[in-house]
Amino acid sequence: MVVTRDEIMRIYRTHVDAELAHDSARAASTYCPDGTYRHMPTGLVFKGCEAVRLQYAMSYVSFPDQGFDIAREVLDGDTLVHWGTLTGTAKGAFLGLPPTGRPIALPFVAAIEFRDGAMAGETLWYDMLTLCEQAGYPFEAVQQASSEARRRLGA
């Protein structure tokens, strides 16, 4: 099924609105049933709408005041890339590490692929060392926790 530019932008705006509202179910509903969320800083891959929903829900626990400002977005074919700044406060556990209460303002880039009237996948990049420095997480502990999470998820 060919997805038009207008349809892609409608799906994308619905998704962004859901993320900003911390509505993990609505954010995940914009994905194809076999959609994938790739979190490159940790190496974690979430496959299927339920796993994607849980990923969003976990991020809202880790950073309950999480938000983002999109500086720019570019759509080419069936792929949209946007970049900006992720903001929030480390008020909840992150990868099992205790909250620090420290704020973050983290530059990010995300690429979103579309297929059959939905998001086929999203890939998120940011610098983990920058997150650790801002939030006060020990980098080595985050690396170890990421490795353990990948092992548990079979990624």
Model-derived features: where do they sit?
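C-terminal and inter-domain tail/linker signature
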Residues: 1-155
